[in-house]
């Protein structure tokens, strides 16, 4: 995570490997280490069963942000009204309210989320942890790319795991980060 790319900026890390090789354990260890560096770790696991639900992993991320606010680690970076709006949005998409997201709805939500992370990043470094990112939905990948490409990797980083069998799909979803030299891939192999 603290390594730098050719452009001398911090790089995000994707950990690839087969099932049972230790990707999640390495991710957990990195999450513990991040806390020691006074960074804010935000974690979500992606599941095959939930891969069709729009923005499902982000619900966990926002829950963790709320926990950090309640525990005094973060100042409230969005208004209670914006939080209520995001809550309604996520509850609707998670409870299977299958109405397609309107373009305007998504843009408003994306803007609120970018503003939230921008405000958090003014005072804190944040690391987004996603386990089994191969199960992340397209819209979640879109939002992740947007956050990292808009705000850069100086204050917000990504660390994720994925099954090597899904390498092509994951790399296509993170292609923009690769092109900017924002992502370093580590392959774990069994002994």
Where are the language model's segments positioned?
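Key residue(s) within conserved catalytic/signature motifs
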Residues: 1-191
